[in-house]
């Protein structure tokens, strides 16, 4: 039960990003929604494994900069999405590039890397735990992308602006939480 709750918690940033991506890419069909969800699920599942094996070596360095990296990436993607809303005001048919997709996946899974470090101090099975995390993230991201797609079809450029603001907010929340302000 603990791992399921952890998986849901780790997936929340991906859910928000997926909803924003769905709004941005209202032309996406099931295949592309599945692809986006798979990438987010993969990174959420892989990062704890990386943290588990390499975390002890780099945990001090990662903890010092992870919030700045996440803030910069999510802030950039959010601002870009807001600017894109001005260009695509009639119809939202943007495509999410691989670089943008992976940047978002990395930014939203940095916390999973830190969780992986803590796994080395528990009796949890790392492989099973990470499979659960990846699967839960995939399912939640799939649903969120689909919901975002529908909202994007209804609200058009307003959905992009809201999605961009959500990404900026998530990045800001990560930053102020890690700095101890919140």
Swiss-Prot record:
UniProt keyword annotation of Lipoprotein present? no
- Which InterPro entries is this protein grouped with? Mntp/YtaF, Put_MntP
Compartment(s): Cell inner membrane
Task: Write out the transmembrane intervals.
Answer: 3-23, 42-62, 65-85, 126-146, 161-181
The keyword Kinase is assigned to this record? no
Membrane association type = Multi-pass membrane protein
Q: Name one GO molecular function term.
A: manganese ion transmembrane transporter activity
Keyword terms of this UniProt record: Cell inner membrane, Cell membrane, Ion transport, Manganese, Membrane, Transmembrane, Transmembrane helix, Transport
Q: Name one GO cellular component term.
A: plasma membrane
Pfam families per the UniProt record, alphabetical = Mntp (PF02659)
Q: Which family is this sequence assigned to?
A: Belongs to the MntP (TC 9.B.29) family.
- PANTHER family with a match to the protein in the record: MANGANESE EFFLUX PUMP MNTP-RELATED
Q: What is this protein's function?
A: Probably functions as a manganese efflux pump.
Protein name per Swiss-Prot or TrEMBL: Putative manganese efflux pump MntP
């Amino acid at each position: 039960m603990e791992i399921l709750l952890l998986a849901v918690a780790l997936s929340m940033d991906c859910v928000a990003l997926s909803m924003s991506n769905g709004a941005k890419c209202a032309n996406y069909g099931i295949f592309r929604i599945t692809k986006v969800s798979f990438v987010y699920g993969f990174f959420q599942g892989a990062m704890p494994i990386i943290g588990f094996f390499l975390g002890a070596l780099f945990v001090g360095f990662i903890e010092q900069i992870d919030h700045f990296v996440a803030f910069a990436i999510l802030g950039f993607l959010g601002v870009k999405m807001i600017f894109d809303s001005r260009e695509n005001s009639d119809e939202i048919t943007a495509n999410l590039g691989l670089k943008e997709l992976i940047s978002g996946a990395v930014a939203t899974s940095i916390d999973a890397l830190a969780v992986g470090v803590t796994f080395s101090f528990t009796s949890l099975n790392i492989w099973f735990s990470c499979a659960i995390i990846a699967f839960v993230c995939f399912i939640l991201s799939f649903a969120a992308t689909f919901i975002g797609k529908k909202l994007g079809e209804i609200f058009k450029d307003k959905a992009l602006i809201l999605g961009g603001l959500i990404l900026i907010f998530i990045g800001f929340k990560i930053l102020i939480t890690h700095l101890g302000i919140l």
